[in-house]
Regions:
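Aromatic- and acidic-residue-enriched carbohydrate-binding clefts of CAZyme catalytic domains
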Residues: 199-217
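Short, solvent-exposed turn/loop segments enriched in Gly/Ser/Thr/Pro and often Arg
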Residues: 173-175, 186, 249-257, 687
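Intrinsic-disorder/low-complexity accessory segments
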Residues: 19-138, 142-166, 215, 221-222, ...
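Carboxylate/His-rich catalytic cores and anion/metal-binding grooves
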Residues: 148, 165-188, 193-194
């Protein structure tokens, strides 16, 4: 039996590399193994580490293993990726524990119930082991066949004893689409003699790479917003099992050493209990022992942190769970030269295997401490009173998505039944949600609502803030109110309200509702005559009487001498059934404002959008836009690689979107002609805005830091030969070299929320109920407003920082700077957007800016 495991471990090597791994590289002592348990290559025909395994191979082997072993059962499909790949998890424990699995699962809810009578000593700890949320960090997922095999086949008494005290939830891959994308790449770019040169094509993936999911999102940043099916499934799994420890297996730069938690202490989230970090350190002692025994170097307490509460290793910290991050140096393929020597894929797998076993040992040894911590987290904290209130005037769809996110975190949400005035705002019953602070998940609710401006350290691994009501641009209370009256929320639609009324005049659609854009595209595609109101008005309707309508209201009317076609009426009826309010007009005459026959209703046409992708572009930025158009607007998008753009006839499109500069010969002239002929260019990001200005497509001027001003002044003095102005006066003061990194970090903007002032009469501002707009900022470049008084629809306020870190100098530069500028060029326009309006797919508050640019681009020409 020893030979079986030796063969398995040796199979981790390839060719000449096999000799670098022996049985003792993974296990110091090899127990007898159950011969009835199939080894990986017996099922898939592929040895672990021989090449990168695909999703279906891992699932096939683990399912076979579960059939063969009494220590392993499948928990079923908890999600399906956009690419159609199922995500399956498995429970691994002693046969006795698995026989009582439903009982132990039910007890998980009792552990966090202060009124439950549960003997903790009789409960096993739950360990959630998650691998490869980044698909091209593949050693984690590729380790799971080996981990599961050893747990199923071992006769080691110590490990069997550990399984009596631990239920393992094995989540073998969190990102199957990215995993397969990377497996396809690396397996297709290696021969029988793999290259260890870091410059080799195998080690430098094309864009998009395997890190991201189907729509090119980082799924490890999707725990908080859970916009994608993989995240929603794993979130449900997490709350179903309420683990005591959650493991998050990653890879990092090839020249690093292995990392495990704890992270940098100064960057721990202030809501994380101290005991959490103590337990993290205790668990770390078991990893240290395992890695020291093999002479494997590692590091802790630097580089990575526990601040952003939306990653796999930090999210659990606010639910009574201990989150642990592992970072293995990556071979990014079969083998790669590093400063530490030749790093092979098998070595990476063996370290993930080793960390898996040390985690099981630690969880079993600390079972009582972990269970007590989890119970105390929920039963001993001080309970707060009151409710947070939030509303989205005129946009129930946006509010419903906000509620969905909260409920995904098991946060209770209720409906306000009586109007409340608080913090200078009136919150109306029937339109406002109320979130009670007195609930089990109050801690995570607090981090979602929290606004933070003061920080112990100003260096961040990820973003510095994530205030959810600002992401949705909701009218909300910053503090809890105690005078709210509430009831359970209802999600049903009144049958009478779901029936489309008849009108010979036409139908009005409130553009404020986030469900309206998808309907608009369908209407235009169906050939409907759709117009948009460029001024507010009050109209008479057949179903609701007199109704006030704002900028951007859609008017679906019959064409001359025709009635509205039945396919168009069917689209309207279906939208009404799904909850979107459709108002049949009773008359073209309006009591106030423009009449329905006014020339202030502009005719809309079907947009045809091209987005620049591929070499040189950002997968994140383009993926966010692709997801918005494809999944939310339900409209097609043409994606063209940057190196092919010059060969595309842009006359076939109404819009070109780029999130990166396109510095290729002839492209600027091509785009200039496109814009002058009526096209719209959406240029997103500071470097893209600068490129558009440099290319002569737009005008943008920048605000300068004090250092930039000094540099410019020095250059001017040198050019003029001004001897009276000495360099000593203009050069920066001398500073210690060791402070350079921190000084640079202070200048960065790593995810802050700024308060913008929005012109809601501008076509890009149509559908907003308020001029206040919260924008997510990730760049430290600041743009001046346009010298055209009508062309800066978003300008930041004079004190714009709502939450997050931003240096004093950057705050000064941000004040009254522009977030969005429109440049007219011929019949078309260039829209300059410094910020991502669709950040991580959950910044619903600002995504409408891009949507408006797509549908209302023809309205951007300044009226004469």
């Amino acid at each position: 039996m020893k030979q079986l495991l030796f063969t398995l471990i040796a199979a981790l090597g390839m060719g000449a590399n096999a000799a670098s791994l022996s049985l003792n590289d993974v296990l110091s002592e090899v127990p007898a193994l159950d011969p009835s348990i199939p080894i990986p290559e017996a099922v898939t025909g592929v040895k672990v580490g021989e090449r990168h395994w695909y999703h279906h191979e891992i699932v096939r082997y683990l399912n076979t293993l579960a059939d063969a072993s009494p220590r392993m059962v499948p928990l079923g499909e908890h999600a399906k990726s956009y690419g159609g790949r199922v995500l399956i998890s498995y429970a691994i424990s002693s046969p006795e524990n698995l026989a009582r699995l439903d009982e132990f699962k039910a007890a998980r809810a009792a552990i966090i119930d202060p009124n439950a009578d549960l003997e903790l000593s009789e409960q096993p700890a739950v360990l959630h082991m998650m691998y490869s949320v980044h698909g091209n960090e593949a050693s984690g997922a590729n380790a799971t066949p080996l981990v599961a095999y050893y747990l199923a086949a071992t006769t080691d008494e110590n490990l069997l004893s550990q399984l009596e005290n631990v239920i393992i939830i094995l989540n073998p891959m969190l990102n199957p689409d990215g995993l397969d994308r990377f497996a396809n790449w690396t397996n297709a770019h290696r021969g029988i003699n793999p290259s260890n040169d870091p410059n080799d094509r195998e080690h430098t993936e094309a864009i998009p790479n395997g890190r991201t999911n189907y729509y090119w999102f980082d799924l490890n940043r999707d725990w908080l917003p859970h916009q994608h099916p993989e995240s929603r499934g794993r979130l449900a799994l997490f709350h179903e099992w309420k683990p005591n420890v959650q493991l998050d297996f990653h890879e990092q730069g090839s020249n690093s050493n292995f990392f495990f938690m704890p992270g940098k202490p100064e960057r721990t989230n202030p809501l994380t209990p101290d005991i959490n970090q103590i337990l993290t350190a205790k668990i770390g002692e078991y990893h240290a022992q395992a890695f020291d025994a093999e002479g494997i170097r590692f590091f802790t307490e630097e580089g990575y942190d526990d601040f952003f509460m939306g990653k796999g290793s930090t999210y659990p910290d606010l639910f009574g769970t201990v989150g642990i991050l592992f970072e293995q140096p990556s071979s990014r393929g079969a083998v790669q030269d590093t400063v530490n020597g030749k790093l092979t894929f098998p070595i990476s797998i063996s370290n993930q295997f080793r960390a898996s076993l040390s985690s099981i040992k630690a969880t079993a040894a600390l079972k009582d401490n972990l269970l007590a911590y989890q119970r105390n987290f929920y039963t001993e904290r001080k309970r707060k009173r009151g409710y947070y209130l939030a509303s989205a005037e005129g946009d129930p769809t946006r509010l419903q998505e906000f509620v969905r996110i909260l409920r995904g975190h098991q946060i209770e949400v209720e409906a306000l039944t009586s109007d409340v005035t608080a913090e200078g705002k009136t919150f109306k019953a029937g339109e406002t949600i109320a979130i009670p602070l007195a609930q089990p998940q109050a801690t995570y609710l607090e981090t979602l609502w929290r606004e933070q401006l003061e920080f112990e350290e100003n260096v961040f691994y990820d973003v510095s803030t994530w205030t959810l009501p600002w992401a949705f641009n909701l009218s909300h209370t910053r503090d809890a109110v105690t005078n709210a009256k509430t009831e359970a929320m209802s999600s049903s639609v009144d049958d009478d309200e779901s029936k489309l009324g008849k009108s010979a005049i036409g139908y009005l659609i409130d553009w404020r509702d986030s469900a309206s854009p998808a309907l608009l595209y369908d209407l235009l595609e169906a050939g409907a005559n759709v117009r948009v109101a460029t001024a507010p008005f009050t109209a008479l309707t057949t179903n609701e009487g007199s109704i006030n309508f704002g900028y951007g209201t859609l008017f679906v009317a019959p064409k001359l001498q025709e009635s509205i076609p039945q396919p168009v009426l069917s689209l309207l009826a279906e939208a009404q059934t799904e909850g979107l309010a459709i108002y049949p007009a009773a008359s073209s005459y309006t009591p106030e404002g423009i009449d329905l026959g006014s020339r202030a209703f502009d005719v809309l046409s079907l947009p045809k959008v091209l987005m620049v992708t591929g070499p040189g572009t950002s997968a994140y930025g383009t993926g966010e836009i692709w997801h918005l158009l494809d999944r939310r607007l339900d409209m097609p998008l043409t994606m063209v690689d940057s190196n092919r753009l010059s060969r595309v006839n842009l006359d076939d499109y109404t819009h070109v979107i780029t999130t990166t500069p396109v510095r290729l010969e002839g492209v600027s002239k091509q785009l200039e002609s496109f814009i002058k002929d009526g096209g719209i260019l959406w240029a997103q990001g500071a470097s893209t805005v600068a490129w558009a200005a440099d290319a002569g497509l737009a005008t943008a001027t920048w605000r300068e830091t004090a250092q930039q001003v000094r540099k410019d002044s020095l250059q001017t003095a040198i050019e003029r030969g001004d001897e009276a102005l000495s360099q000593a006066e203009l050069l920066p003061a001398r500073k210690p070299f060791a402070t350079a990194s921190d000084e640079y970090a202070f200048t960065l903007v790593r995810g802050s929320i700024l308060q913008g002032n929005l012109d809601i009469s501008h076509p890009l501002g149509f559908g907003y109920a308020s001029e206040a707009l919260a924008v997510f900022r990730t760049t430290n470049r600041f743009m001046n407003p346009s010298d055209n008084a009508y062309s800066s629809p978003v300008v930041y306020t004079d004190s714009p920082l709502l939450s997050g870190y931003m240096s004093t100098e950057n705050q000064t530069l941000a004040a009254n700077s522009a977030g969005l500028v429109v440049n007219q060029l011929g019949k078309g326009a260039v829209i300059l957007s410094l910020d991502s309006t669709t950040f991580r797919a959950f910044w619903w508050g600002s995504q409408r800016l891009l949507v408006n640019g797509i549908f209302f681009g023809s309205l951007l020409e300044e009226p004469r």
